[in-house]
Amino acid sequence: MNKEELFDVTVIGGGPAGLYSAFYSGLREMKTKIIEFQPHLGGKIHVYPEKMIWDIGGLPPITGAKLIEQLVEQGLTFQPEVVLNEKVESITRDEYGTFLLTTSSGQQHFSKTVIIATGSGILKPQKLAIEGAERFEVSNLNYTVKSLKHFKDKTVIVSGGGNSAIDWANELEPLAKKVYVTYRKEALSGHEAQITQLLNSSVTCLLNTSITKLIAGENHEAIERVELTNHETGEISYLSIDEVIINHGYERDMTLLENSELNIEMIDNYFIAGNANSESSIPGLYAAGDILKHDGKLHLIAGAFHDAGNAVNKAKQFIQPDASEYGMVSSHNDVFKKRNRELMKQMIE
């Protein structure tokens, strides 16, 4: 890759904040690139494809999978260059002020500005710490719920006591034959309303209890029973199950910010310290979505869109100081005239 391939803005991360950054930068006629570690765009929403999302203004309840589909379609409106399966490991800057992004495969990407939209970082589920557990990942040991129907009429045990574990248990309760939740602590730690729903349902909660062994059936391919250990009494019990779901949180890979030669101001050694305009401590480098922290920050998908728009506006003015502070609203923008005519035609046919 040569330096002639210089982009106006490079967005690191292809989740909601990154995709909206790509859309809005295209709207502002900026040459845009997205670099995403995963083999697909959409970000963390892939973890909960069938969950209903209610808190995006103007949208009725929508599944995670459908939202990803719409976000990707919008994000690619202006045909940004998309680089998948590449992990950005460092950001440097040359004597001319150009950002150099280096990936784990050795690729180099050059950009006038950068928007970091890595969300919670590169997430990897914390695996069940039991020897040999990995062999059941192809059968009935799950680290996410991709399809609720898969668990219909089955006996399911969910290990974990945080928001995701409780949400999954609540979602599965009306579908599954029986749902158990096991948690190593004495009290669940999710949102109050979700905990109340769980405790008032048919789900059986096993607190102060952990899965300590996975026992295969005769074919040795799937888990047939789990061994449970109560941490208060030491009592060991066994439970016959069809599916095991593990939600013990995620490991965050923060290599990008740890390896950066730029002195990016951080909060709690994780968040990028910024302001309401999505500016970081480095001129020309912006942040959007969950990675950004400042007073008044809204930690919702809707807030990520707001961050993205602000980041793009500041990036545009950084490159072109006499540019308008804000992009033109879509209802008056010439770039949508042809597409609007097509949509109107479809509406009246």
Curated annotation (Swiss-Prot):
Q: Which InterPro entries match?
A: FAD/NAD-bd_sf, FAD/NAD-binding_dom, Fd--NADP_Rdtase_type_2, Ferredoxin-NADP_redctase_2
Transmembrane as a keyword of this entry, yes or no, is no
Q: Enumerate the catalysed reactions.
A: 2 reduced [2Fe-2S]-[ferredoxin] + NADP(+) + H(+) = 2 oxidized [2Fe-2S]-[ferredoxin] + NADPH
Q: Which UniProt keywords apply?
A: FAD, Flavoprotein, NADP, Oxidoreductase
**E.C. number, please?**
1.18.1.2
Pfam hit, one: Pyr_redox_2
Which cofactors are required for activity? FAD
Query: What does UniProt give as the signal peptide span?
Result: none
Q: Which domain of life is it from?
A: Bacteria
- Which terms in the Gene Ontology molecular function aspect does this entry carry? ferredoxin-NADP+ reductase activity; flavin adenine dinucleotide binding; NADP binding
Record-annotated residues binding FAD? E36, K44, Y48, V88, L123, D290, S331
| Keyword Metal-binding set for record | no
Bound how, and how many: what does the cofactor note say? Binds 1 FAD per subunit.
Family membership, please give it. Belongs to the ferredoxin--NADP reductase type 2 family.
Question: What HAMAP family does the entry give?
Answer: FENR2
Q: How does it assemble?
A: Homodimer.
Note the PANTHER family from the entry.
THIOREDOXIN REDUCTASE 1-RELATED-RELATED
For this entry, the protein name equals Ferredoxin--NADP reductase 1
This protein's species is Bacillus cytotoxicus (strain DSM 22905 / CIP 110041 / 391-98 / NVH 391-98)
